[in-house]
A protein has these predicted regions:
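Short loop/edge segments at beta-strand edges and connector loops
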Residues: 13-15, 84-86, 92, 140, ...
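Rossmann-like dinucleotide-binding cores of NAD(P)H-dependent redox enzymes
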Residues: 18-19, 24-28, 34-109, 166-174, ...
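Glycine/Thr-rich phosphate-binding loops of Rossmann-like dinucleotide-binding domains
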Residues: 1-2, 37-38, 126-128, 167, ...
Length: 282
């Protein structure tokens, strides 16, 4: 990432964090997205003092904002410090650890920890394959444009996964590959992204499928939101003592499900059912 001083410190990527053999006493995570929050959850459970620095005004950008705030509150109770709407301006190595200098509405500040995890996203590899020799149409974010069959602007060239930049999820790439093979072999099929679930494996889990309230509001689509506390489930209460959980369903005026978002440890299992309802038009 283009942060002054980052090239001079031995920071972690998510792969480094997984390969690490020792538990640090403290950890700063730059980036409060999916990967950042999953590692924050993991290291907090090991007793590590974690600080999350996020440029946006809420963690988990792209997920339901209300539920993301609820998850953040749960982890604040567990001791994670969050610095939101905060820009990292410099990284340096000192005798007491790695120091991250930042700026936000409260002014300038620093946070020092034993380890630094950079979780600000990854870029797909686009060089070294000869792609520059093809007359491919690219997006502004250097991803390859595709149609509903995953075919690029060059007939016979199909692009699945992160390189098309639509949905950076492994299960999405599997479905995209299926659609591409069907098109190549003459079977009727087309890619739809409206009901692809996403899960953040924190504790509690948070999951979503379909449109969020923010997306519906931005698109000017009328909807109603129905929220049901997970506390209505005896199993949830038994397994998640003291934890807030909620299931939020977003529906059109005729009752068609447009999106569903859940906070609570059954979320990764239940979200698939919500996706089925969206795909079926119920």
């Amino acid at each position: 990432p283009p942060i002054p001083g980052v090239e001079n410190v031995d920071y972690w990527t998510h792969r480094d964090a997984l390969d690490n053999k020792e538990v640090p006493a403290s950890l700063t995570i730059v980036g409060g997205g999916v990967i950042g929050m999953e590692f924050a959850s993991f290291f907090t459970s090991l007793g590590v003092q974690v600080t999350v620095v996020e440029m946006l005004d809420e963690i988990l950008g792209g997920m339901d904002k209300e539920l993301s705030a609820m998850l953040r509150a749960e982890y604040a109770k567990k001791g994670i410090k969050f610095l939101l709407s905060t820009k990292v301006v410099e990284v340096s190595k000192g005798e007491t650890g790695i120091t991250v200098s930042y700026e936000n509405a409260d002014g300038a500040g620093t946070v020092t920890a034993d380890k630094l995890l950079m979780s600000v996203g990854r870029r797909p590899v686009t060089k070294g394959f000869g792609l520059e020799n093809l007359n491919l149409e690219w997006t502004e974010r250097r991803c390859i444009k595709v149609d509903e069959h995953l075919q690029s602007s060059v007939p016979g060239v199909y692009v699945c996964g992160d390189l098309n930049g639509v949905s950076l999820l492994a299960h999405t790439a599997v479905r995209e590959a299926e659609v591409a093979v069907h098109h190549i072999t003459g079977k009727e099929d087309a890619m739809s992204y409206r009901a692809i679930p996403g899960v953040v494996y924190t504790n509690p889990e948070i999951a979503g499928v379909g449109m969020s309230e923010e997306a519906l509001q931005a698109a000017g689509i009328p909807y109603r939101a129905v929220k049901l506390p997970m506390a209505y489930s005896g199993r949830f209460v038994a397994e998640n003592e003291g934890v807030n959980g909620v299931c939020k369903v977003l529906a059109a005026e005729d009752g068609t499900v447009l999106g569903a978002h859940m906070l609570g440890n059954p979320a990764s299992e239940l979200i698939v059912l919500a996706g089925m309802a969206i795909e079926d038009g119920k």
